[in-house]
Amino acid sequence: MINPNPKRSDEPVFWGLFGAGGMWGAIIAPVIVLLVGIMLPLGLFPGDALSFERVLTFTQSFIGRVFLFLMIVLPLWCGLHRMHHAMHDLKIHVPAGKWVFYGLAAILTVVTAIGVITL
């Protein structure tokens, strides 16, 4: 018999943030690491293109703040979601694990938002 009042799951929201963070970490983050961490220090990228003044101007614009926010928050949600499910897979049952991991991700998201807004 089909339950006429099925319980709604909050898991799709967390899976969505996990998927978005995974895609961001796989596509966008390596490009930024390549540019800022490898090409710029080795002189393979024009230094004035990523000068302090230009980067500061970009990060203080709306699109720059959104980019910086997403660069921090999406991989954060992905990582904490992975940790939550890794604990479950290893049979290490954290009391209220969903609240611990997703709550920490939510708190760090708010902290990041405050930091990016006040930048």
Swiss-Prot record:
Signal peptide: none
GO biological process terms held by the UniProt record: fumarate metabolic process
Subcellular location: Cell inner membrane
NCBIfam families: PRK05470.1-1
Organism: Salmonella paratyphi A (strain AKU_12601)
InterPro entries the record matches: Fumarate_red_D, SQR/QFR_C/D
Protein name from the UniProt record: Fumarate reductase subunit D
Role this protein plays: Two distinct, membrane-bound, FAD-containing enzymes are responsible for the catalysis of fumarate and succinate interconversion; fumarate reductase is used in anaerobic growth, and succinate dehydrogenase is used in aerobic growth. Anchors the catalytic components of the fumarate reductase complex to the cell inner membrane, binds quinones.
